[in-house]
Structures are given as structure tokens and as C-alpha cells.
Regions:
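Active-site microenvironment for binding and transforming phosphate-containing groups
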Residues: 1-265
Length: 265
């Protein structure tokens, strides 16, 4: 495998030593839904291919393989803190600690925390003053479950201040592509989201379309993150499925886009 191509995720105000990115598919091999770079073990890909992708990423970033902290892709709103206690665990205990986790928060330098997404919104956060970074997988379940609220609260418990937090949303499915059933609209209604902001109906089909980016922007604002500290990628994973993986377009058994963040010091 050659070098991995990244979509760099920029914060409004760059933070020295902090870097965030999303992977792209690389050189797509015909109809292979896992081609070329896939870091997710739980989507039916050959484990050796996933391992090769992870090794390539670690080498390219100049980290050891065990410095990549990646939970299995889960549609949850739970958050794990990666600290020295976690790092001291054996591999099985580390895996158990990340089971069912949808977001990671850390103050540690020298590690990459990241998540895999198929179409959901990957969100990286940083408080440069407190030295705290985070990453979240905000699919529709995680979004409706208030994953961003949980992440910001966890960051603040570690010493972050909401006014100092910056957030960047990476490549994800756009509203036009994200057609959903009414049961998903109901889930957002029950969670008290403003449906006038996040839902529109297709005039021809009557089907609902949800704007996950807008929903998570509202969640960031509600959590106290200033609007001026939020950036949003306009890349759509479904429209650009030749560049980013899309479970909606390619099927559940396909690769995932990896979004990571790390700090060097």
C-alpha cells in the first residue's frame, strides 16, 4: 500500500502541535467496496487488509501501531477518556474499555484517537488552552443520543472551557442524500431537535431528508461552543463515494472513512 491521502480538517484558529484529518479511499480497485484504505475491522473486510491499512497510517504519521486508539464502529453516544490508566491495560482490557464507545477524549500527546464512519458526521474537537482533544462519530443514532453534549461535558470535566473549544466536522452524507423513514424523524422529535431546521421533505416523493450537519452544529451551539469556532466540511460521502466510503451508496459491507486527531506535545 502506498501513501494514504488525507482530507485535512482545519480548525478556525490553528492549534500548535494539533493535527486532524480524514482518510480518503485512495486508488479505488474497480468494484471492491473496501478499496483502497480501510481501518475498520467490523465491516466484513479481510483482517489483513485492515491491519495493513493501520500499519501504513501509523508509519506515515510516525507513530507506533499501538498508538492508534480506535473503537469498533458503534452507533452510540457513550464517551471514553483515554488516559494513562487506559494505556496501562492489556490489549483485551483496552478493547473491552472501548466496547460500545462512540467518542474519545484525551489529554495525552503522542497518540492518535480516531473513529470510523460510513456516512455519519466525524467531529474533532480541541481546547488548545487546556490541551484536550476529542473525536466523535455522530451518525443519526449518536446525534439523536446527544453524543456531542456528552463529549463537551467530558472535556469540561477534564478542564476545558466551552468558549475555548473548537470543532470541525468532516466528510459526511449531505441532506439531499440522507433520505430516512419517519421512524428516524420521530427519534429526533422525541429528542427535542428542531425539525424545522434539520428535516425537509422531497416534494416529489414525500420522503424525509435529515441534515446531520445542521443537527450537530445546533448541538455544539447548545453545548456552549461559539458559532465562530465551528467549521463544516461540504464533502458528501455519498456524492463522492469514489473518494470517501459511503455505506448508503456502497452497502453496509464496505470500507469506512477514518477520522483522527492527535497532538504532538
Amino acid at each position: 500500500m502506498c501513501m494514504i491521502d488525507f482530507e485535512i480538517m482545519d480548525f478556525v484558529q490553528p492549534v500548535a502541535g494539533v493535527h486532524a484529518f480524514s482518510t480518503t479511499r485512495g486508488q479505488v480497485d474497480g468494484g471492491n467496496p473496501y478499496s483502497e484504505v480501510n481501518l475498520c475491522y467490523t465491516v466484513g473486510d479481510d483482517a489483513l487488509h485492515v491491519l495493513d491499512s493501520r500499519i501504513t497510517l501509523a508509519r506515515q504519521l510516525r507513530f507506533d501501531l499501538d498508538d492508534l486508539i480506535i473503537p469498533g464502529q458503534k452507533h452510540s453516544s457513550s464517551v471514553a477518556v483515554i488516559d494513562e490508566d487506559y494505556r496501562s491495560l492489556d490489549i483485551e482490557s483496552q478493547d473491552a474499555a472501548l466496547d460500545g464507545v462512540g467518542a474519545l477524549v484525551t489529554q495525552l500527546s503522542g497518540i492518535v484517537i480516531g473513529i470510523n464512519t460510513g456516512d455519519g458526521v466525524p467531529i474533532v474537537l480541541v481546547d488548545g488552552q487546556a490541551g484536550i482533544i476529542a473525536v466523535a462519530h455522530a451518525g443519526w443514532r449518536g446525534t439523536a443520543g446527544r453524543i456531542i453534549k456528552n463529549v463537551v461535558e467530558k472535556m469540561c470535566r477534564l478542564g476545558a472551557r466551552t468558549n475555548d473549544i473548537q470543532a470541525a466536522m468532516g466528510p459526511s452524507i449531505c441532506q439531499d442524500c440522507f433520505e430516512v423513514g419517519d421512524e428516524i424523524v420521530d427519534a429526533f422529535a422525541q429528542a427535542h431537535f428542531d425539525l424545522n431546521v434539520i428535516v425537509k421533505r422531497n416534494a416529489s416523493t414525500g420522503q424525509a431528508h435529515i441534515d446531520l450537519r445542521a443537527a450537530n452544529r445546533d448541538e455544539l451551539l447548545a453545548a456552549g461552543v461559539p458559532a465562530s469556532n465551528i467549521t463544516t466540511s461540504q464533502h458528501c460521502s455519498s456524492c463522492e463515494h469514489d473518494r470517501f466510503f459511503s455505506a448508503r451508496h456502497l452497502g453496509i459491507n464496505s470500507g469506512r472513512t477514518f477520522t483522527g486527531i492527535y497532538k504532538l506535545y
